[in-house]
């Protein structure tokens, strides 16, 4: 799901026949091997938090944010498996289904912003979770009271912030384009100076800074000799910073070089794996 027209050699304006259709089908199935279990796991987590034990978790800020993160992950993976990667990696579907997206632009008006919202949301929810944990560690005796007080404020804020990043995709014109036999969507920015890549990159920088700062503060405020908690906190921080850094490198690379003739094709495929690090992790 790209921001503007790139200069790919195999880019076209209609479905094209390619000899290695099975190769791209296999890419989809390889992605599905880890995305389907992740989808099932997120659905199970949601059932636990909001159905089976809703009374226990509903007033806890951290678990409320985790619930939000889980819902977004479910939507994200569902869109990947049923729309985005399906129609990119299955050229067999291109002639029929691309026409639906072209003739009924409302489909892309909904799916394109929603998909990018899910991508950005992980940056916000993970930052909110680590800040919530920091609050629990610094003020353990008041954590329940603070949780009940802050939940009505934090949850709407966490939902709203990603909208700032994807707002230009909501109001901009979308276009169906064709690549390697499949198709996907781009948008032509209504406000040229507002880039999805640059805004997301800004959020990523803040998320990395928040994770590093919060993790250091959590370790400092943990009870002495609590090595297991310290190790888990450090591992979580390292993995999160690594995942966000990968996204940051991609957004930087894409923002700087996407219009160059030598821009490599594998970057489009690689972006899915980069974002999957945080979705699956």
Regions found by a protein language model. Name each.
Residues 1-281:
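Seven-transmembrane-like multi-pass membrane architecture, highlighting hydrophobic TM helices
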């Amino acid at each position: 799901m790209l921001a503007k027209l790139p200069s790919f050699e195999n880019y076209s304006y209609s479905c094209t026949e390619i000899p290695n259709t099975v190769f791209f089908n296999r890419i989809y199935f390889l992605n599905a091997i880890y995305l389907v279990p992740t989808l099932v796991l997120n659905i199970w987590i949601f059932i636990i938090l909001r159905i089976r034990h809703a009374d226990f978790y509903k007033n806890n800020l951290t678990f409320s944010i985790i619930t939000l993160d889980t819902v977004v992950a479910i939507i994200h993976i569902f869109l990947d498996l049923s729309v985005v990667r399906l129609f990119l990696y299955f050229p067999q579907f291109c002639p029929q289904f691309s026409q639906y997206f072209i003739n009924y632009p409302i489909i892309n008006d909904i799916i394109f912003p929603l998909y990018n919202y899910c991508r950005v949301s992980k940056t916000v929810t993970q930052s909110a979770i680590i800040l919530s944990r920091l609050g629990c560690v610094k003020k353990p005796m008041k954590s329940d009271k603070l949780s009940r007080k802050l939940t009505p404020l934090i949850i709407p804020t966490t939902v709203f912030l990603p909208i700032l990043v994807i707002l230009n995709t909501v109001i901009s014109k979308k276009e169906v384009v064709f690549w390697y036999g499949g198709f996907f969507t781009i948008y032509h920015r209504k406000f040229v100076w507002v880039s999805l890549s640059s805004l997301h990159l800004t959020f990523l920088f803040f998320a990395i800074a928040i994770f590093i700062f919060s993790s250091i503060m959590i370790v400092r405020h943990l009870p002495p000799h609590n090595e297991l908690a310290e190790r888990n906190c450090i591992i979580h921080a390292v993995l999160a910073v690594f995942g966000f850094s990968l996204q940051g490198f991609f957004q930087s690379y894409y923002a700087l070089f996407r219009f160059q003739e030598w821009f490599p094709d594998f970057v489009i495929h690689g972006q899915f794996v980069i974002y999957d690090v945080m979705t699956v992790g």
